[in-house]
A protein has these predicted regions:
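Short sequence/structural segments immediately N-terminal
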Residues: 1, 7-19, 26-34, 42-49, ...
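Gly/Gly-Pro-rich "capping" loops immediately C-terminal to redox-active cysteine motifs
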Residues: 1-26, 60-64, 76, 80-107, ...
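Residues at helix-coil transition
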Residues: 11, 40-44, 68, 76, ...
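C-terminal capping alpha-helices of c-type cytochrome domains
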Residues: 24-48, 101, 120-157
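The canonical Cys-X-X-Cys-His
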Residues: 35, 39, 63, 68-77, ...
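Electrostatic cytochrome c docking/interface patches
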Residues: 40-66, 82-86, 152-158
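Short flexible/disordered coil segments
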Residues: 46, 77-89, 112-116, 141-154
Length: 158
């Protein structure tokens, strides 16, 4: 899945102005595979990037209903995804990342996804995207993806 994402960024199919300059420097398929292999060894910091607003509990409850009705069939009820079908892990992803990706898919800036994603997200309002992103970020990250050492925030991240 990471190889496809990097290839899509490099070709301009996937909108990511931050990564594009780096991805386009990868000279061939082996370089893409090498970088994807390395990225695949990285882990998710525990409890990193959760929605922290005072209304988080309400957002999680509302987002859970949206997730169960629109996302769980492909991404699994626990958000673990289906690697063999190229459905990514959503559980424990960073709230802002999830919100940005779903907004870009809904708004047509990201076109490297199955038609079902466009259909599912086309009916989501901005508020719905905040709710479902809050819920997905609150899910437990699969154990195999967690960092075992604490990650400290930089001043920019705080």
């Amino acid at each position: 899945m990471l190889i496809k994402q990097l290839a899509d960024i490099r070709s301009g199919v996937r909108y990511n102005p931050t990564m594009y300059p780096f991805a386009r420097k990868l000279p061939d398929a082996q370089a893409l595979a090498d970088v994807a292999g390395y990225i695949g060894t990285l882990c998710f910091p525990l409890d990193s990037g959760k929605y922290e607003g005072a209304d988080a509990a309400g957002h999680i409850a509302g987002g859970k209903l949206l997730y169960e009705n629109n996302c769980a069939r492909c991404h699994q009820p626990n958000g673990a995804g289906k690697k063999e079908a190229l459905y990514p892990v959503l559980a424990g992803q960073h709230f802002r990342y999830l919100l940005r990706q779903m907004t870009e898919i809904r708004d047509g800036k990201r076109v490297d996804v199955p038609a079902e994603m466009f259909e599912a997200l086309s009916m989501f309002s901005n508020a719905d995207l905040v709710l479902v992103s809050t819920y997905m970020a609150s899910l437990n990250t699969p154990e195999s993806l967690l960092c075992r050492t604490p990650v400290t925030k930089t001043k920019k991240q705080e």
